[in-house]
Amino acid sequence: MKTLLLTLVVVTILCLDLGLELTNAPDSWSSRRTCLCPAWVPLRSRPVAGHSKQCGSRGRRVDLGCAATCPIVKPGVNINCCSTDNCNPFPKRS
């Protein structure tokens, strides 16, 4: 019985796609970053733009990545959460 149960678990893992994949970089980037998270986690892809001392002369700092939930917004930080591919393009310079 244990062998049958173990076999079913292995087959399920191999046959089902247990990950949700979002691409987090626009096509123009030379390397695309991809987040793989379990399908049961509500995945959010979020760019976070804010000013920092190191990057003040270069414009806004933008972080693209995955999070299980949309983070709490802090003053001076712009957060955009989404759950589809390429929904958070890198902002264009103005």
Curated annotation (Swiss-Prot):
Gene3D superfamilies, sorted: CD59
Signal peptide per UniProt: 1-19
Main location: secreted
Localization per Swiss-Prot or TrEMBL: Secreted
Keywords: Acetylcholine receptor inhibiting toxin, Disulfide bond, Ion channel impairing toxin, Neurotoxin, Postsynaptic neurotoxin, Secreted, Signal, Toxin
Tissue: Expressed by the venom gland.
Alphabetized Pfam families for the sequence: Toxin_cobra-type
Annotated S-S bridges: C35-C55, C37-C66, C70-C81, C82-C87
CDD domains recorded: TFP_snake_toxin
GO cellular component: extracellular region
GO molecular function: acetylcholine receptor inhibitor activity; ion channel regulator activity; toxin activity
InterPro entries documented for this protein: Snake_3FTx, Snake_toxin-like_sf, Snake_toxin_con_site, Toxin_cobra-type
Other notes: Has the length of long neurotoxins, but only 4 disulfide bonds, as short neurotoxins. In addition, the position of cysteine residues is not conserved.
Biological role stated in the UniProt entry: Binds with high affinity to muscular nicotinic acetylcholine receptors (nAChRs), whereas it binds with a low affinity to neuronal alpha-7/CHRNA7 nAChRs.
Family: Belongs to the three-finger toxin family. Long-chain subfamily. Type II alpha-neurotoxin sub-subfamily.
Full protein name: Long neurotoxin-like OH-31
